[in-house]
Amino acid sequence: TLSSSSAASDVYKRQDFDPFWQYLEDNKIPFMLHIGPGTKTQPSKFRNNGRERAADLHGGGENLRFPDFMCLWYAPQEFLTAMVYDGVFQRFPDLRGGVIESGAGWVPEFLRMLDHGWYSFNKTDQYLKDMDLMPSEYIKRAVRFTPFPNEDVGHMIRDSAPELYLFSSDYPHPEGTKDPYGKFEASLEGFDEEVKDMFYRTNYDHMMFRKSEALAEAAE
Protein backbone atom coordinates (compact mmCIF):
# COMPACT_ATOMS: atom_id res chain seq x y z
CA THR A 1 0.00 0.00 0.00
CA LEU A 2 1.44 3.34 -1.10
CA SER A 3 0.99 6.83 0.24
CA SER A 4 -0.70 8.94 -2.43
CA SER A 5 0.39 12.27 -0.96
CA SER A 6 1.97 14.85 -3.25
CA ALA A 7 5.39 14.38 -1.67
CA ALA A 8 5.27 10.64 -2.24
CA SER A 9 4.06 11.09 -5.81
CA ASP A 10 7.18 13.12 -6.57
CA VAL A 11 9.23 10.03 -5.72
CA TYR A 12 7.11 7.34 -7.36
CA LYS A 13 7.02 9.00 -10.76
CA ARG A 14 10.80 9.43 -11.05
CA GLN A 15 12.55 7.00 -13.36
CA ASP A 16 15.06 6.02 -10.68
CA PHE A 17 12.08 4.43 -8.92
CA ASP A 18 11.49 2.20 -11.96
CA PRO A 19 13.11 -0.88 -10.33
CA PHE A 20 10.26 -0.84 -7.82
CA TRP A 21 7.58 -0.78 -10.51
CA GLN A 22 9.51 -3.44 -12.43
CA TYR A 23 9.54 -5.63 -9.32
CA LEU A 24 5.77 -5.28 -8.86
CA GLU A 25 5.14 -6.03 -12.52
CA ASP A 26 7.50 -9.02 -12.67
CA ASN A 27 6.12 -10.54 -9.47
CA LYS A 28 2.47 -9.77 -10.22
CA ILE A 29 2.00 -7.59 -7.15
CA PRO A 30 -0.59 -4.78 -7.40
CA PHE A 31 0.00 -1.41 -5.78
CA MET A 32 -2.76 -0.03 -3.55
CA LEU A 33 -3.81 3.49 -2.66
CA HIS A 34 -5.86 3.51 0.53
CA ILE A 35 -7.30 6.16 2.78
CA GLY A 36 -4.80 6.93 5.52
CA PRO A 37 -1.81 9.14 6.34
CA GLY A 38 -1.31 10.16 2.70
CA THR A 39 -4.94 11.12 2.19
CA LYS A 40 -5.61 14.80 1.75
CA THR A 41 -7.99 16.34 4.25
CA GLN A 42 -9.38 19.84 4.37
CA PRO A 43 -6.49 22.29 4.96
CA SER A 44 -6.40 23.48 8.55
CA LYS A 45 -6.83 27.14 7.54
CA PHE A 46 -10.39 26.36 6.47
CA ARG A 47 -11.15 25.05 9.96
CA ASN A 48 -10.32 28.42 11.47
CA ASN A 49 -13.98 29.43 11.33
CA GLY A 50 -14.73 30.26 14.95
CA ARG A 51 -16.86 27.14 15.42
CA GLU A 52 -16.26 24.14 17.64
CA ARG A 53 -15.05 21.17 15.64
CA ALA A 54 -17.68 18.47 15.16
CA ALA A 55 -17.20 14.92 16.39
CA ASP A 56 -15.74 12.54 13.85
CA LEU A 57 -17.58 9.75 12.05
CA HIS A 58 -17.22 7.34 14.94
CA GLY A 59 -17.94 9.90 17.64
CA GLY A 60 -14.31 10.27 18.68
CA GLY A 61 -11.71 12.86 17.95
CA GLU A 62 -9.33 11.85 15.18
CA ASN A 63 -11.14 10.39 12.21
CA LEU A 64 -13.14 11.40 9.18
CA ARG A 65 -15.45 14.41 9.06
CA PHE A 66 -17.63 15.89 6.31
CA PRO A 67 -15.10 18.49 5.04
CA ASP A 68 -12.40 15.80 4.89
CA PHE A 69 -14.72 13.37 3.11
CA MET A 70 -15.12 15.90 0.32
CA CYS A 71 -11.34 15.80 -0.26
CA LEU A 72 -10.81 12.03 -0.26
CA TRP A 73 -10.24 11.71 -3.98
CA TYR A 74 -7.78 14.60 -4.39
CA ALA A 75 -4.70 12.55 -3.48
CA PRO A 76 -5.55 9.56 -5.74
CA GLN A 77 -6.24 11.92 -8.64
CA GLU A 78 -2.88 13.64 -8.21
CA PHE A 79 -1.05 10.34 -7.86
CA LEU A 80 -2.66 8.70 -10.89
CA THR A 81 -2.22 11.82 -13.01
CA ALA A 82 1.51 11.75 -12.23
CA MET A 83 1.69 8.03 -13.04
CA VAL A 84 0.06 8.65 -16.42
CA TYR A 85 1.87 11.87 -17.34
CA ASP A 86 5.32 10.70 -16.30
CA GLY A 87 5.01 7.51 -18.30
CA VAL A 88 5.00 4.91 -15.51
CA PHE A 89 1.97 3.08 -16.92
CA GLN A 90 3.49 3.27 -20.41
CA ARG A 91 6.87 1.87 -19.33
CA PHE A 92 5.19 -0.88 -17.30
CA PRO A 93 2.13 -1.95 -19.29
CA ASP A 94 1.37 -4.90 -17.01
CA LEU A 95 1.43 -2.86 -13.80
CA ARG A 96 -1.85 -3.02 -11.89
CA GLY A 97 -3.28 -1.38 -8.82
CA GLY A 98 -6.34 -0.32 -6.87
CA VAL A 99 -7.77 2.78 -5.22
CA ILE A 100 -9.47 1.56 -2.07
CA GLU A 101 -11.91 3.34 0.25
CA SER A 102 -11.75 6.66 -1.55
CA GLY A 103 -15.11 6.37 -3.29
CA ALA A 104 -15.45 6.15 -7.06
CA GLY A 105 -18.13 8.61 -8.15
CA TRP A 106 -15.35 10.98 -9.22
CA VAL A 107 -13.75 8.48 -11.60
CA PRO A 108 -15.79 9.05 -14.81
CA GLU A 109 -15.16 12.79 -14.79
CA PHE A 110 -11.52 12.26 -13.88
CA LEU A 111 -11.09 10.09 -16.99
CA ARG A 112 -12.78 12.70 -19.14
CA MET A 113 -10.55 15.44 -17.76
CA LEU A 114 -7.42 13.37 -18.41
CA ASP A 115 -8.37 13.03 -22.06
CA HIS A 116 -9.54 16.65 -22.26
CA GLY A 117 -6.14 17.70 -20.98
CA TRP A 118 -4.44 15.56 -23.62
CA TYR A 119 -6.46 17.15 -26.42
CA SER A 120 -5.76 20.61 -25.02
CA PHE A 121 -1.99 20.28 -24.60
CA ASN A 122 -0.65 17.48 -26.82
CA LYS A 123 0.39 19.80 -29.66
CA THR A 124 2.94 21.54 -27.44
CA ASP A 125 3.78 18.86 -24.85
CA GLN A 126 6.24 16.24 -26.05
CA TYR A 127 5.39 13.89 -23.18
CA LEU A 128 1.76 13.78 -24.24
CA LYS A 129 2.81 13.26 -27.86
CA ASP A 130 4.88 10.24 -26.82
CA MET A 131 1.96 8.42 -25.19
CA ASP A 132 0.89 5.26 -26.99
CA LEU A 133 -2.61 5.37 -25.45
CA MET A 134 -5.05 8.04 -24.42
CA PRO A 135 -4.56 8.92 -20.73
CA SER A 136 -7.88 7.36 -19.69
CA GLU A 137 -6.90 4.09 -21.36
CA TYR A 138 -3.90 3.69 -19.07
CA ILE A 139 -6.21 3.98 -16.08
CA LYS A 140 -8.74 1.53 -17.52
CA ARG A 141 -5.99 -0.99 -18.15
CA ALA A 142 -4.16 -0.66 -14.85
CA VAL A 143 -6.42 0.56 -12.04
CA ARG A 144 -9.56 -0.60 -10.25
CA PHE A 145 -11.70 1.43 -7.83
CA THR A 146 -13.99 0.55 -4.92
CA PRO A 147 -17.16 2.67 -4.71
CA PHE A 148 -18.89 3.24 -1.40
CA PRO A 149 -22.16 1.26 -1.07
CA ASN A 150 -24.21 4.46 -1.11
CA GLU A 151 -22.73 5.49 -4.47
CA ASP A 152 -24.53 4.69 -7.71
CA VAL A 153 -22.12 2.25 -9.29
CA GLY A 154 -24.59 1.55 -12.09
CA HIS A 155 -24.39 5.18 -13.14
CA MET A 156 -20.60 5.07 -12.95
CA ILE A 157 -20.48 2.03 -15.21
CA ARG A 158 -22.79 3.65 -17.76
CA ASP A 159 -20.71 6.81 -17.59
CA SER A 160 -17.32 5.12 -18.03
CA ALA A 161 -16.55 1.39 -18.24
CA PRO A 162 -17.57 -1.79 -16.36
CA GLU A 163 -13.98 -2.98 -15.89
CA LEU A 164 -13.12 -0.10 -13.55
CA TYR A 165 -15.10 -0.94 -10.40
CA LEU A 166 -15.16 -3.71 -7.84
CA PHE A 167 -17.19 -4.66 -4.80
CA SER A 168 -16.05 -3.64 -1.34
CA SER A 169 -17.93 -3.57 1.96
CA ASP A 170 -15.10 -2.30 4.23
CA TYR A 171 -16.45 -4.68 6.89
CA PRO A 172 -16.53 -4.23 9.86
CA HIS A 173 -16.37 -0.45 9.49
CA PRO A 174 -19.75 1.32 9.57
CA GLU A 175 -19.30 3.14 6.26
CA GLY A 176 -19.96 -0.20 4.58
CA THR A 177 -23.58 0.11 5.81
CA LYS A 178 -25.73 -2.78 7.02
CA ASP A 179 -26.41 -4.12 3.54
CA PRO A 180 -23.72 -3.20 1.01
CA TYR A 181 -24.65 -6.07 -1.28
CA GLY A 182 -28.29 -5.01 -1.39
CA LYS A 183 -27.36 -1.41 -2.15
CA PHE A 184 -25.04 -2.41 -4.97
CA GLU A 185 -27.60 -4.85 -6.38
CA ALA A 186 -30.22 -2.10 -6.53
CA SER A 187 -27.75 0.14 -8.32
CA LEU A 188 -26.89 -2.62 -10.82
CA GLU A 189 -30.49 -3.31 -11.77
CA GLY A 190 -30.80 -3.75 -15.52
CA PHE A 191 -27.24 -4.94 -16.07
CA ASP A 192 -26.61 -8.45 -17.36
CA GLU A 193 -24.85 -11.12 -15.31
CA GLU A 194 -21.56 -10.59 -17.12
CA VAL A 195 -21.30 -6.98 -15.93
CA LYS A 196 -22.31 -7.96 -12.39
CA ASP A 197 -19.73 -10.74 -12.40
CA MET A 198 -17.09 -8.20 -13.37
CA PHE A 199 -18.06 -6.00 -10.43
CA TYR A 200 -18.25 -8.78 -7.84
CA ARG A 201 -15.41 -11.01 -9.02
CA THR A 202 -13.40 -10.70 -12.21
CA ASN A 203 -12.33 -7.06 -11.84
CA TYR A 204 -10.77 -8.06 -8.52
CA ASP A 205 -9.14 -11.05 -10.17
CA HIS A 206 -7.63 -8.77 -12.80
CA MET A 207 -6.28 -6.37 -10.20
CA MET A 208 -4.71 -9.24 -8.27
CA PHE A 209 -3.22 -10.89 -11.39
CA ARG A 210 -5.53 -13.86 -10.94
CA LYS A 211 -7.03 -15.82 -13.80
CA SER A 212 -10.84 -15.72 -13.64
CA GLU A 213 -12.83 -18.86 -14.14
CA ALA A 214 -15.78 -18.68 -16.48
CA LEU A 215 -18.99 -17.55 -14.78
CA ALA A 216 -20.59 -21.00 -14.99
CA GLU A 217 -17.53 -22.66 -13.45
CA ALA A 218 -17.33 -20.12 -10.65
CA ALA A 219 -20.96 -20.75 -9.73
CA GLU A 220 -20.45 -24.49 -9.25
Give residue spans per PLM region.
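Single conserved hydrophobic/aromatic residue that forms the stacking wall/gate
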Residues: 1-8, 12
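Short, well-ordered coil/turn segments that N-cap beta-strands
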Residues: 27-29, 93-96, 135-143, 163-165
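Alpha-helical scaffolding segments of alpha/beta enzyme cores, especially the outer helices
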Residues: 19-26, 87, 186
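C-terminal active-site-proximal or functional interface alpha/beta core segments in diverse enzymes
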Residues: 57, 70, 74-78, 108
